[in-house]
C-alpha cells in the first residue's frame, strides 16, 4: 500500500509542477523501501515509463511545439543513453554494497536536482542562453538519458534546464523535450533490464501497487483544471527531494 501512496503522490505533484514523476519518488523509495537497489531501480523505471506514457497520450492531442526531426534526434539520443545507462549501472552497482550504492546514487541525484534548482532560481537571470543549433539536441538527449537511466530517474529537471540554457527554449518546448527524453530513455533501460533479468521482473508484488499509483496520479494531474506549471509546488517539491536525498546520504555514511 505504501508504494501505491508514494507513487500516486509523487506522480501527481511531480507532473503538476512539471518536474516529472520520479523527482520525488526516487529518493523517497531509497529512504523507506527495504528492497535492494536493483529492485528500487526497476520500480522507479516502471513508474517513470507509466507516467510518461499517460502524459504522451494527452500531449498527442495538441500541436507539438518541436519539429519532428528534432523529436527524432531526442528519441534516438535518449534511447541510446537509456541502454548504456542501464548497462553501466548494472556493472557498477553489482560491485558495491547497499550503503555504498545508496550513497553514490543519492549524491548524483542531489547534484542533478540541485543544478536546475540553482539555475532557475538565480543563474538564469545572469547567464544568457546559448541559442545553440538544435542538432545538439542529440548529444543532449544522450547525456540526460544516460544519467537518467543510470539513476532510474527521468531527469526531467535536468532536461528543462539544458533546453532553456542551450537552446533558449520556451516552457512548452522544454516540457515536450523532457517528456520525449524520459519516455525513450526509460524504454531503452527497460528493454535491457528485461533482457538481463531474462524477462522476469524482481519484486513484482511491489510493482502491482506502485504502477497503478503512478498511472492514477498522472491521470489526475492531466485534469484541465490542474494544467499549467505551479511554481510554488515545484519549488517545494525540489526542496523536499533535495532534503530526502541528503537524509539518504547521511544514512549511508553512518
What is the meaning of each model-derived region?
Residues 42-58:
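Transmembrane alpha-helices of multi-pass small-molecule transport proteins
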Residues 17-25, 151-162:
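Transmembrane helix boundary and interhelical junction motifs in multipass membrane proteins
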Residues 128-132, 156, 160, 164, ...:
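Functional transmembrane core segments of multi-pass inner-membrane proteins
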Amino acid at each position: 500500500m505504501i508504494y501505491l501512496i508514494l507513487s500516486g503522490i509523487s506522480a501527481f505533484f511531480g507532473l503538476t509542477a512539471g518536474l516529472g514523476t520520479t523527482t520525488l519518488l526516487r529518493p523517497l523509495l531509497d529512504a523507506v523501501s527495504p528492497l535492494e537497489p536493483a529492485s528500487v531501480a526497476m520500480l522507479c523505471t516502471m513508474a517513470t515509463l507509466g507516467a510518461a506514457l499517460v502524459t504522451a497520450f494527452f500531449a498527442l492531442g495538441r500541436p507539438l511545439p518541436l519539429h519532428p526531426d528534432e523529436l527524432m534526434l531526442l528519441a534516438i539520443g535518449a534511447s541510446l543513453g537509456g541502454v548504456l545507462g542501464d548497462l553501466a549501472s548494472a556493472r557498477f552497482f553489482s560491485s558495491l554494497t547497499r550503503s555504498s550504492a545508496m550513497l553514490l546514487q543519492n549524491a548524483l541525484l542531489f547534484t542533478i536536482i540541485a543544478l536546475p534548482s540553482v539555475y532557475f532560481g538565480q543563474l538564469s537571470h545572469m547567464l544568457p542562453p546559448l541559442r545553440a543549433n538544435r542538432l545538439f539536441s542529440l548529444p543532449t538527449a544522450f547525456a540526460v538519458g544516460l544519467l537518467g537511466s543510470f539513476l532510474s530517474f527521468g531527469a526531467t529537471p535536468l532536461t528543462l534546464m539544458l533546453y532553456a540554457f542551450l537552446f533558449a527554449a520556451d516552457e512548452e518546448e522544454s516540457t515536450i523535450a523532457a517528456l520525449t527524453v524520459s519516455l525513450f530513455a526509460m524504454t531503452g533501460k527497460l528493454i535491457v533490464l528485461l533482457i538481463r533479468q531474462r524477462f522476469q521482473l524482481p519484486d513484482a508484488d511491489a510493482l502491482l501497487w506502485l504502477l497503478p499509483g503512478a498511472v492514477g496520479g498522472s491521470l489526475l494531474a492531466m485534469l484541465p483544471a490542474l494544467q499549467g506549471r505551479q511554481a510554488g509546488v515545484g519549488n517545494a517539491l525540489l526542496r523536499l527531494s533535495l532534503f530526502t536525498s541528503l537524509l539518504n546520504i547521511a544514512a549511508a555514511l553512518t
